[in-house]
Amino acid sequence: MLALGKLLELTLTDHEPAEKTQVTPKGVRLRWLGEGALEVRPPEGDDCGLDLLLSAGIHGNETAPIELLERLLHGVANGKIKPRSRVMFLFGNPAAIRKGERFIEQDINRLFNGRHELSSGFEALRAAELEQFARVFFSKPERARLHYDLHTAIRGSKIEQFALYPYKEGRKHSRRELARLAAAGMEAVLLQSKSSITFSAFTYEQLDAEAFTLELGKARPFGQNEQVNLDKLEERLIQIIEGNEPEAGDSLDGLKLFSVAREIIKHSEGFRLHLPVDIENFSELSKGYLLAEDLAEMRWVVEEEGARIIFPNPKVKNGLRAGILIVPDSGQRLD
């Protein structure tokens, strides 16, 4: 196997390869771009016209997606996977991956779409670097652009594998992309309705990629992800990389759609979230339930039918989202 196929090993050891470009016997070109970043180019004349960005490790303790990218890259480097798509493999926060921690100083997935310019420190610099990697990768005209940012969650979930679909004013969510997600094993998709500061929101809003945050189970240490079944996703990603993906059609049977009703924003250290510490994502909440309180008699009371909570986290910094209240969506606004 080509040495550049061991991107995770290079990242974990903080090692820069002596040879920055390698070519497989079949003409697939691997190029090291910087820490945690590798570009794969298909052989000349065998390119299907897709640019695919696969990122993981934005949070360093979310290891199942990192291991998935490692398997895919090994397959490319040893010739078992035969790319016809141009692919970038990207490990988001190498320092946090090495420590096995969510982040070093601050959550890097709250620093995109210009937010890093208002901050400082290691993660702010890395967010700017990740944006530049993506900007250069997606700069080629007249090519399809797809970004999957792979994560696992800090808590359990009643729906284990789901996606978040970013928002851009004037741009509709794609039914075809939702069907592709369903074929890849996603059980639900949250259709977002406002701009965001995550990595996938940046590539969707600024670089015109079809982009998604994929939540794939619960965060566990390296080598302890037997309970996270990524077989369907891995199979689909190989098909996308090889350019032989079966047509998914536009049927969304079995895929649950949700939209954001409200975001719960923490404004002060007086913020209180009235939920059990171990509550799971997608837990249902009844109308009239007092969800959260903050200073100045600020209260969040559930008013929506069928409301559920995802990503509850009262420990975020002031001004950030401490949870999302979501409701079922009919999908009538899809393209």
Curated annotation (Swiss-Prot):
One of its GO terms (biological process) is arginine catabolic process to glutamate. Pfam families: AstE_AspA_cat, AstE_AspA_hybrid. GO terms for molecular function: hydrolase activity, acting on ester bonds; succinylglutamate desuccinylase activity; zinc ion binding. InterPro entries: AspA/AstE_fam (IPR050178), AstE_AspA_cat (IPR055438), Aste_AspA_hybrid_dom (IPR007036), SuccinylGlu_desuccinylase (IPR016681). It catalyses: N-succinyl-L-glutamate + H2O = L-glutamate + succinate. Gene3D superfamilies: Zn peptidases. It is an enzyme of class 3 (hydrolase). Its cofactor is Zn(2+). The keyword Hydrolase applies. CDD domains: M14_ASTE (cd03855). The active site is at residue 215. The keyword Zinc applies. Zn(2+) binds at residues 59, 62, 151. Pathway: Amino-acid degradation; L-arginine degradation via AST pathway; L-glutamate and succinate from L-arginine: step 5/5. Binds 1 zinc ion per subunit. Transforms N(2)-succinylglutamate into succinate and glutamate. Belongs to the AspA/AstE family. Succinylglutamate desuccinylase subfamily. This is Succinylglutamate desuccinylase. It comes from Pseudomonas putida (strain W619).
